[in-house]
């Protein structure tokens, strides 16, 4: 059984037991998190597709840790004008383990 969920403006295909890195969540480490924006659920014989979301489906998970991604360096310059700006960015993320996919109905 797998589901497609939306969180942080992105869509993820998840199964029970998966560990994924998603955009940072406000929950603390070891807290439960529930994803209500479930777009699709497929089990052994049935496929349910939402329009756009399935109201009767939920995906539950546990926040394992928070962290920062790889550093991205942004460098801007104007030739011949001695204008240079170097800036770095590390995107925060949350690592979540999918515990259960619930489909009521």
From Swiss-Prot:
A GO cellular component annotation in the UniProt record: cytoplasm
An example molecular function term from Gene Ontology annotations: structural constituent of ribosome
Keywords: Ribonucleoprotein, Ribosomal protein, RNA-binding, rRNA-binding
Keyword RNA-binding: yes
SUPFAM superfamilies: L21p-like (SSF141091)
Superkingdom per UniProt: Bacteria
Matching Pfam families: Ribosomal_L21p
Function: This protein binds to 23S rRNA in the presence of protein L20.
Family recorded in the similarity comment: Belongs to the bacterial ribosomal protein bL21 family.
Assembly and oligomerization: Part of the 50S ribosomal subunit. Contacts protein L20.
HAMAP family, A to Z: Ribosomal_bL21
Name of the protein this chain belongs to: Large ribosomal subunit protein bL21
Natural source organism: Natranaerobius thermophilus (strain ATCC BAA-1301 / DSM 18059 / JW/NM-WN-LF)
Lineage of source species: Bacteria, Bacillati, Bacillota, Clostridia, Natranaerobiales
Gene that specifies this protein: rplU
């Amino acid at each position: 059984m797998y589901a497609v969920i939306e969180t942080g403006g992105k869509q993820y295909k998840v199964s029970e037991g998966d560990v994924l890195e998603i955009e940072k969540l406000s929950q603390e480490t070891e807290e439960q998190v529930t994803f209500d924006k479930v777009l699709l659920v497929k089990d052994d014989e049935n496929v349910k597709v939402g329009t756009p979301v399935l109201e009767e489906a939920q995906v539950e998970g546990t926040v394992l840790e928070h962290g920062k991604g790889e550093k991205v360096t942004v460098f801007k310059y104007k030739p011949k004008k001695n204008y240079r700006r170097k800036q770095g960015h590390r995107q925060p993320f949350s690592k979540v383990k999918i515990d259960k996919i619930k489909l009521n109905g």
